[in-house]
Amino acid sequence: MAGNEWINGYLEAILDSQAQGIEETQQKPQASVNLREGDGQYFNPTKYFVEEVVTGVDETDLHRTWLKVVATRNSRERNSRLENMCWRIWHLTRKKKQLEWEDSQRIANRRLEREQGRRDATEDLSEDLSEGEKGDGLGEIVQPETPRRQLQRNLSNLEIWSDDKKENRLYVVLISLHGLVRGENMELGSDSDTGGQVKYVVELARALARMPGVYRVDLFTRQICSSEVDWSYAEPTEMLTTAEDCDGDETGESSGAYIIRIPFGPRDKYLNKEILWPFVQEFVDGALAHILNMSKVLGEQIGKGKPVWPYVIHGHYADAGDSAALLSGALNVPMVLTGHSLGRNKLEQLLKQGRQSKEDINSTYKIKRRIEAEELSLDAAELVITSTRQEIDEQWGLYDGFDVKLEKVLRARARRGVNCHGRFMPRMAVIPPGMDFTNVEVQEDTPEGDGDLASLVGGTEGSSPKAVPTIWSEVMRFFTNPHKPMILALSRPDPKKNITTLLKAFGECRPLRELANLTLIMGNRDDIDELSSGNASVLTTVLKLIDKYDLYGSVAYPKHHKQSDVPDIYRLAANTKGVFINPALVEPFGLTLIEAAAHGLPMVATKNGGPVDIHRALHNGLLVDPHDQEAIANALLKLVSEKNLWHECRINGWKNIHLFSWPEHCRTYLTRIAACRMRHPQWQTDADEVAAQDDEFSLNDSLKDVQDMSLRLSMDGDKPSLNGSLEPNSADPVKQIMSRMRTPEIKSKPELQGKKQSDNLGSKYPVLRRRERLVVLAVDCYDNEGAPDEKAMVPMIQNIIKAVRSDPQMAKNSGFAISTSMPLDELTRFLKSAKIQVSEFDTLICSSGSEVYYPGGEEGKLLPDPDYSSHIDYRWGMEGLKNTVWKLMNTTAVGGEARNKGSPSLIQEDQASSNSHCVAYMIKDRSKVMRVDDLRQKLRLRGLRCHPMYCRNSTRMQIVPLLASRSQALRYLFVRWRLNVANMYVVVGDRGDTDYEELISGTHKTVIVKGLVTLGSDALLRSTDLRDDIVPSESPFIGFLKVDSPVKEITDIFKQLSKATA
């Protein structure tokens, strides 16, 4: 039946139309059927079948299908076609109803899970309240509020950002990864990734840079060195502002707004956002390098020698939110999130259509990876910025990590200073996007407002035509009568933009067709066949509908336009007394509605999403149901025919448009982020001291080779002793420095007496600081009991160390680190039994990244990094977490099923492996415990933010702070000691603990030793395989070895990876 596949798509369209117009009939099938079309007296089997199975179907479309079915002379073949069509309708309907049932079950289960999570959280929170405080429970705190009361409450405790903030000199980081991002001649609409978000982030960066108190704004995006796109997207830096754009007091050598393009993924290819996911960590490492360099530069310019850290890191969309969360954790600075378009909302819409299974949707849109990135972003974000209230209630409300009611409870407790037991919810703030009005030419509201239009179409006799924009001519050439009011729609040819419904509404309303023209600006195209299937389908349907309704001369659909033409297009529609329409099925905000209002165009817009808030502010048009063709046509007809209403809407739009200006947006934005809990790296090193240390240890490095080769040369010409010892000469400055390196001075300042540990660490830290490369051993070899497998692990560690030191070039300034889920005591016992000195390693990352130690203390003791605990402490609530995990793990089994009361516990706390930032448990029955993704979901529903993982061959479960991990610990070393992640070599097996995937991606070099790890914990990671969306299948940064590879082969793979670039 391959030749009849068109029927499936056509019948799906019929089933989805849900139009009204068929009168219900109760006729029953007869033995003899007359198939002729007549006056309605004969039985119509097609009509009967569709009416019985799918109610409310328009028979006009069905009749056209019927004509194709009966288009044959052979009655037997005709009957077979009829029977086949009927069976297809039946099958599609059953499938649709099955999907609807599954959808309702899924929604019901999620509702129950959310209610259970909220109930558990409020029970735990109420335990420490007094009787008087218990009245402030969930039901009493959550009361409906009027918009005015809500605004007063939200802003009452906030200090409004004003011009007296100039002394702040902030550094703000924005991230928008996908699409084609540049400051001028933006290619909006060139593909589905280059839309309104690109314009928004560029204009936001410019507007923020002009605000008092903001010194520099960096907008991070992807660098693309491909012949498929313009060369400008390969430029690493693009300046968005000039000195004239910024406040005079804020200008400086590095001030202003910039686009910073970071290479990640294949540099010679332009990739859609769905393909970028495996390379997100590469971006994080590249962006981190830029931020560290810039913080140092800004520190020299405006920070009095101290680093100037980003005030906030603001991610836009899921991919940038994921990146911003990791950067926020690495730098310990606040994160802000704007979703723009949300994955759960998109998934719900696609499932309701019933045309794709969940697996097909995920394959096309990578929707599971996107949703998990959005959940992680919610975990890490201090503030979530939305365009509308509807986005908070109906879209973010779908996520595990945000509960409106629980958020209000936690906020009320925090306001009273009551313990929240480690539970957190991000704050939501509605801040409508701004608009740049500098290019808007407001026309006088006079009858002569169409003078330019009159000159274009002929002008007055004897007068010379005025110069008019080229795009006007491009649009006007389509029209038979260009004097009619113009209905303007401007969007990508995306199915969700609902352009075809608009065209049907226009085509089927004769009064509207006679009174107005329709202009469709649907991006840019050269050949429809070269577009994506979705865009091509919309454009093809548009052309067919124009032909169907014979709209030639009434509809314009130009192929090309520039971004600079858009204001002229708005002005053309306004000069014809036209209307702007946005009929999208759901519109997250609707920036084009604001642009149209600024140019004096009334609007007709969808009632779903952001236009509701815009209409409430501007009062400049009408809202419609985007599924109702008749309502769309009536609203358009009302505005173009009633001139008084048209003028009223035009004036209202102009009067209220200031509410959406960029200065207003940025003022509210800065007010909101100023209320975030500011945090930054805890160490603040004196610049002069650092410089002196750098000079001192630079000399140390220059003399190290001489010392290592045991060339005992006397500095003053005397012959040294046989053991190479030298008596320092007080008159020789070189000897003085060397003496200080061997015997650190004992400082007696009172303020340093309580910092003996830090002083001891100071003598060792610079060794790590001066390393050029770091080899990190992160192999997870454990036996069935979770003990380290010495037979597999020890030879590999020894061979790696031997391979690095066998090459003179690599041996120079190379250090070693070990990264493991074992606690420090167990790790040191293992190394001792393997006869490997702890001093071989510059750092030890223990307990799944919750602790960092350095050798070098007195008597060979290991000393903890004094700043690391505070660095990873964000949103860590240990006691509340322990109680909740114990309940969940002993009441819920794998798959989310409830366990019987009285069943033996599945976990036992492992106090020996726990520390202040790691809760460890021993697993008694690994076949019954929840997977990581299920446990993380249940913890999020209860407001708990953390990083759970199974390790040591699934015999242990460890829970560490949200942004702590073995991979994040490497970034901490980069931030703390400026040892670039790109110069790290991470050695892993081909499987490991459930955080194994995080160790593979990034700009560090990964060496995967095949066959080294036979037992792992990956089976307990997630219910579906998403590895291809997290780890790149091919990468120049990944090399492979066999477990029995000789030392020379190991050396060769290190050399090969050292040459790798993105």
Curated annotation (Swiss-Prot):
It catalyses: beta-D-fructose 6-phosphate + UDP-alpha-D-glucose = sucrose 6(F)-phosphate + UDP + H(+). Residues 113-122 have a biased composition (Basic and acidic residues). It comes from the Eukaryota. GO terms for biological process: sucrose biosynthetic process. Homodimer or homotetramer. Plays a role in photosynthetic sucrose synthesis by catalyzing the rate-limiting step of sucrose biosynthesis from UDP-glucose and fructose- 6-phosphate. Involved in the regulation of carbon partitioning in the leaves of plants. May regulate the synthesis of sucrose and therefore play a major role as a limiting factor in the export of photoassimilates out of the leaf. Plays a role for sucrose availability that is essential for plant growth and fiber elongation. Activity is regulated by phosphorylation and moderated by concentration of metabolites and light. Pathway: Glycan biosynthesis; sucrose biosynthesis; sucrose from D-fructose 6-phosphate and UDP-alpha-D-glucose: step 1/2. Its EC number is 2.4.1.14. Residues 113-141, 715-735 are annotated as: Disordered. InterPro entries: Glyco_trans_1 (IPR001296), SPP-like_dom (IPR006380), SPS (IPR044161), SPS_C (IPR035659), SPS_pln (IPR012819), Sucrose_synth_GT-B1 (IPR000368). Keywords: Glycosyltransferase, Phosphoprotein, Transferase. Belongs to the glycosyltransferase 1 family. Pfam families: Glycos_transf_1 (PF00534), GT-B_Sucrose_synth (PF00862), S6PP (PF05116). The keyword Phosphoprotein applies. This is Probable sucrose-phosphate synthase 3. GO terms for molecular function: sucrose-phosphate synthase activity.
